[in-house]
């Protein structure tokens, strides 16, 4: 399954504005940006060799601009895309330490940092993720993609030690319900579906394993109606089980 993300980027520029940087160039200007009703599809990151090509340029940029958290973010994201998760952690930590609160790439970087910690798993990574979630929740808790990640975090945390974390079981359900309450906001950027069909699907899974078939069917159906094929398959499997 391939996920789709949206992001806002400056591409329609006034005359005279130039790009700066040796890779992942950005407009070298401080003028204000305004949203436009223009969309463009981009599948370049599906290319398997893009990270290998970009990495030397990013390493050079990180050396040239050691105080710039943007290149630390790009180093971390590139290494993550190359499946070098452990190597990416150093760069994520450096990025998180230096990134200013108003940086446009801050939220994306934090979410990728958290997903990397969840993918690496283990008590230390879960503890680190929990600290970051607690610190960022007052601001990022208004975003569906952050709440979606919280649902995954609480699930992993509970499964890591059911006896110790059983009391956090309701947070799994609450996180996905909050995703649906917030809804989709493509103008914010982020993974498509975390405020709709993906959250509904995960709720369906949660209710199914909890033995609540009625609610599982309700949320699987909601997800399937949005065209999410895994939800349609789960609905079909549940129907077969119930007919036996």
Locations of regions flagged by a protein language model:
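Residue at a conserved register position within TPR or TPR-like alpha-solenoid repeats
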Residues: 79, 117, 154-157, 161, ...
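Flexible helix-coil transition and linker loops at the boundaries of alpha-helical arrays
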Residues: 61-65, 96-108, 134-146, 180-193
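Catalytic-site signature of metal-activated, phosphate-bearing donor transferases
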Residues: 1-90, 115
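Structural motif corresponding to the intra-repeat A-B loop/turn of tetratricopeptide repeats
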Residues: 82, 120-123, 157, 166, ...
């Amino acid at each position: 399954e391939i996920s789709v993300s949206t992001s806002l980027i400056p591409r329609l520029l006034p005359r005279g504005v130039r790009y700066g940087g040796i890779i992942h160039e950005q407009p070298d200007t401080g003028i204000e940006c305004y949203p436009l009703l223009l969309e463009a599809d981009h599948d370049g990151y599906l290319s398997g060799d893009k990270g290998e090509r970009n990495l030397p340029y990013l390493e050079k940029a990180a050396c040239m601009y050691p105080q710039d958290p943007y290149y630390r973010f790009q180093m971390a994201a590139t290494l993550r895309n190359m499946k070098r998760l452990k190597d990416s952690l150093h760069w994520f930590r450096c990025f998180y330490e230096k990134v200013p609160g108003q940086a446009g790439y801050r939220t994306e970087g934090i979410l990728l940092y958290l997903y990397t910690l969840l993918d690496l798993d283990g008590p230390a990574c879960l503890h680190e993720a929990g600290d970051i979630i607690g610190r960022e929740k007052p601001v990022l808790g208004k975003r569906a993609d952050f709440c979606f990640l919280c649902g995954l975090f609480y699930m992993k945390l509970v499964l890591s030690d059911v006896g110790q974390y059983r009391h956090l079981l309701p947070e799994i359900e609450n996180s996905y319900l909050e995703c649906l309450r917030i809804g989709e906001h493509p103008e914010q950027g982020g993974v498509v579906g975390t405020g709709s069909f993906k959250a509904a699907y995960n709720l369906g899974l949660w209710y199914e394993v909890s033995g609540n078939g009625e609610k599982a069917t309700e949320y699987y159906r909601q997800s399937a109606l949005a065209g999410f094929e895994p939800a349609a398959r789960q609905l079909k499997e549940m129907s077969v089980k119930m007919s036996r």
